[in-house]
Every structure is written in C-alpha cells, then in structure tokens.
C-alpha cells in the first residue's frame, strides 16, 4: 500500500546510480546509509560506493559491479607470434598490429546497436579518469578534465590501427 501513496514513496527502490541517485538525494527521497555500512565494506568497495555517494555520505547499495574484459584466442595469438595476453594499452596496440599483419581481425566488435562501442570509450575513460573526474562529470556535467579527451584519443588510436573488424558499425552485437 505504500507504493499507492505517491507522497510517501517506496522504502526500497532500484536506480542506476550517478545523477539519478543525486536527484533522489536532492529531493529528500534517499536515506543516508553511511553509518550502516561497515568500515571494511567502505574500504574494500570505495570505488563502487562512489556512484551512490554525495557530500561524503552513502545513499545506496551497489548491487552489481560490471567488470569488462577481453576474450582472446590463444591459437590466433600464437599464429600472430604473440606469446601472452597484453597487460597494458601499449601492448594491446602492439598486438593489434601483429594480429592485423597476420590477416586476423584483432578485435571483433558489433557496433550497430551502439552500446558495445560505448563500452570501449567507457573502459578507456575508466583507465584514464579518477573517481573525482567521474564525480565532476556526473554531478556538475563538467568534462573539462583532460582524461576524457585522452580516452577519446585512445579510442581513436584503436580505430587508426584498424583494430576492429571491417564493418563493425553495421554488425549487430
């Protein structure tokens, strides 16, 4: 019955975090959970708590962490003369060239649906930007930190290296 009264709102709700959580905080519709979270969780999950924290207070519980990764074929790497998976962006770019030289599409990407391409920029920006820069983007719509441009430059480097399969923008995920 609480859900039937728009004045009271729900006790528990799900949101995407970031600006959506901030809107709920600003509207007085979110409870400060800071003192209900153990110091261990605060320490070990500080990055995850960033998206639901404002002015040093925690207003949400992250229920998912979405790590990204790259699956690769050891056989294709071997065919291209690559002995190990890259561990740096520089190594990735070098391996892209080796794979391309061996006639292998380095990265298979289905970009027609947009979100897979967006993930590449997201992952690269996570690499370049600090939590503070992310918070300024979410809270203030301030993307003046050079990390955002660096992430775009990194993505352009991959495009210039012909890292993705031919026609990736018209290939479905």
Predicted ranges, named:
Residues 6-11, 57-58, 100-106, 161-164:
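Loop/turn elements at helix/coil->beta-strand transitions in domains of secreted/extracellular proteins
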Residues 55, 59-63, 68, 90-140:
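Extracytoplasmic/periplasmic solute-binding protein
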Residues 71:
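Short aromatic/basic micro-patch
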Residues 16-68, 78, 90-94, 120:
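Hinge/lid segment of periplasmic solute-binding proteins
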Residues 96, 138-172:
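Glycine-centered hinge/linker elements that transmit conformational signals in sensory
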Residues 32-44, 107, 111, 128-150:
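Short, solvent-exposed loop/beta-turn-alpha elements that line the ligand-binding surface or hinge
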Residues 75-85, 163:
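Aromatic-glycine-rich donor-binding/catalytic loop that engages nucleotide-sugar donors
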Residues 1-21, 90, 173:
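Early extracytoplasmic/lumenal segment of secretory-pathway proteins
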């Amino acid at each position: 019955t609480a859900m039937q009264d728009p004045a009271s709102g729900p006790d528990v709700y799900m949101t995407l975090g970031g600006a959506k959580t901030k809107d709920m905080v600003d509207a007085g519709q979110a409870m400060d959970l800071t003192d209900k979270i153990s110091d261990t969780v605060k320490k070990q999950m500080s990055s995850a708590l960033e998206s639901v924290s404002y002015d040093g207070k925690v207003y949400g519980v992250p229920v998912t962490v979405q790590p990204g990764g790259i699956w690769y074929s050891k056989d294709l790497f071997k065919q291209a003369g690559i002995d190990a998976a890259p561990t740096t962006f520089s190594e990735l770019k070098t391996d892209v060239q080796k794979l391309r030289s061996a006639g292998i599409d380095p990265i298979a990407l289905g970009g027609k649906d947009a979100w897979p391409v967006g993930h590449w920029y997201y992952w690269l920006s996570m690499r370049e930007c600090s939590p503070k820069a992310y918070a300024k983007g979410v809270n203030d719509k301030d993307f003046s930190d050079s990390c955002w441009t660096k992430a775009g430059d990194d993505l352009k480097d991959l495009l210039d290296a012909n890292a993705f399969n031919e026609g990736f923008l018209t290939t479905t995920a």
